[in-house]
Amino acid sequence: MSHRTPGRPAAVAVAGAMALLLAACSSTAATSAPPAPTSTGAGVALVGAPLEVPDGLDVAPFDEPREVQVPDGWSVSLWARVDAARLAAWTPDGRLLVSRPKQGDVVLLSPGEGEPASTTLLSGLEQPHGLAFAGSTLYVAQSDRVDAYPYDAGRVGDPRPVADGLPDAKSDDLRGAYAHALKSVAVGEDGAVYVSVGSTGNVSEEDRSADPERATVLRVPPGGGEPAVFARGVRNGTGLAVGPDGSVWSAVNNRDNIAYPYDRAADGDGGSDQGEVLDAYVADHPLEPLARLTQGRDLGWPYCNPDPDAEPGVPGSPLVYADRPFVRDVQTNADGAELDCDALAPVEQGMGAHSAPLGLSFAEDLPGPLGDGALVGIHGSWNRQPPRPPEVAFFPWRDGGLGDQQTLLGGFQDADGARWGRPVMAVQGPDDAVYVTDDAAGAVYRMVPPAR
């Protein structure tokens, strides 16, 4: 890789007050009775609510009434149509940026009455994905580089390279084969820049010995310099954000088609199923980590897997997602020679297998029992039966850690598994509403909490 030294980022600015967003006067809404509330823990229940769709935005999938699941008192509206909307970040002057890797651009949404004004802030990029601000400096992660742009009043200046030569499908050794080329970026309180570099495949052991190493989170020092591995064994850490105390967190897409690791019967025939790929086991293993990253941390992939079983290896075991230990991957590390799984720190928090967590951000002072916490856009499974549904998940911030998952926004998947939307990222706005991108529906939703 080649690298240039950026200037020291300013401290992260708090966005100023934004003009009140007025609801559109005419909308379509579901008229059927809402389903019974669903418990999400911590005293929060979900109720059915119509998705409010302004006139002019009511094209598929919003050409018919849609109902979402939210905590009681919240309302949700379709705020903007943005094709293939992915990650998002608020500018210091109260506008929302949305990345679109497929289109190679970053869209700028300027709030006003009704639908926000939409313009293109950046174009001609190579799969832009991660977005982050440090003061008035915008960081954009493309598939092969991270650049810093001076931002002012809806415009950016010339880019300053932070890290280039990052591995992507154009890398000579990959010859176009890169399953997780999209990068995410976050900026620490000290100005260090963190970049996620995904694995090339589901189980690609060569990533750990590649140069530069893949399945990592890299760190560029404050003031610039050579990126170095901050954390490894991070299969696809699309979710990347800095917590309220300055800690770095990642929400990780973990591996698929895991083999049963225990020398015991699991399918009821009496013989050992060790090394067998069993659908019933694959459906719930391994968990998707939501982990605090520290210098040198290893999340195990592809040699060790975090295990949600309260009773390891027992069919039908209760599933637990907090503080989970690792077990050997019997396909890649059967004898433990590749990596000592017992030596790895337990994963702080997690989600159900194949949830596909994408965007990660932190919110402050959400109403009721929610308070501060992490927001995770969960895309939903692609290879599980029944499918794990898409949602926006909330993890309460408690004493420097994250509590158990709660659903903040659901209802995107029908009983038969059909979906009309798939959230990618949720970010709290300067107006305290929560804004949610959806790349399947080509939408940005606005979630308004109840009045305090």
Task: Tell what function each PLM region has.
Residues A33-Q69, L182, T200-N202, A215, ...:
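Beta-propeller domain segments
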Residues R100-K102, S143-R145, Y151, G198-T200, ...:
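Short loop/turn segments immediately following the C-termini of beta-strands
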Residues V427-R452:
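Blade-level signature of beta-propeller repeat domains, shared across WD40, Kelch, NHL, RCC1
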Residues S26-T28:
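Bacterial signal peptide processing site
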Residues V82-D93, S123-A141, S171-A192, R232-S247, ...:
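Beta-rich, blade/repeat-based domains predominating
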Residues Q127, D144-V187, S199-N202:
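Asp-box/WD-like beta-propeller blade repeats and closely related beta-sheet repeat scaffolds
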